[in-house]
């Protein structure tokens, strides 16, 4: 992780979805996998050879074109994402992994799949059916869904290694980054906090929109 004195660097990374570190990872031959919801296990999208990008639409203020396709009644998040996609802001994506959770993000991702929006001939969209109950049947269903709609497509489309060894490596990196962020967050608990809430959230957000091995 970079030192906190580089906060301006982190802030700049949040100005565009296709930021400096995303471009660097793409230049190294890695695949960019977009997602929008915490129901999508971030760590699975960070397997060796690819990296996850939680989609945002920085500085989008008026999603006029997206409203034509979606509706003014749809929340601004989904419309802003689609507006940015129509502007070409997500052309770096190699895939978009959706979840059957929030309706508006489902509609946005369906538009990505049905319309020729992302200028990448190999781009694809897939949806995972997420259970909302915690029982043994739900666990089995969720595991089957992640295998069929996340791991298998990554392996079949882009040759990503989905072995147990690769999964453990991705989990190790994810846990390392999470531990560092938790340690930074602990500074907020001091009697005289040495980091502001704003600074912490900039760092946290960067960890979700940049390749973790580069931050």
Regions found by a protein language model. Give the residues of each.
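A charged, amphipathic alpha-helical module
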Residues: 1-31, 143, 152-215
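TRNA-binding/sensing appendages of the translation machinery
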Residues: 27-53
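Domain-level signal for soluble alpha/beta catalytic cores
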Residues: 30-31, 66, 92-93
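Conserved beta-strand termini and adjacent loop/short-helix elements that scaffold enzyme active sites
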Residues: 36, 55-57, 128-130
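Short, solvent-exposed loop/turn segments at secondary-structure junctions
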Residues: 39-41, 58-60, 103, 132-133
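Anionic-ligand anchoring segments at beta-strand to alpha-helix junctions in alpha/beta enzyme folds, i.e.
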Residues: 44-72
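Glycine-rich, highly charged phosphate/nucleotide-binding loops
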Residues: 69-87
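Internal, well-ordered alpha/beta segment that forms a basic, Gly-enriched binding/recognition surface
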Residues: 90-91, 95-187
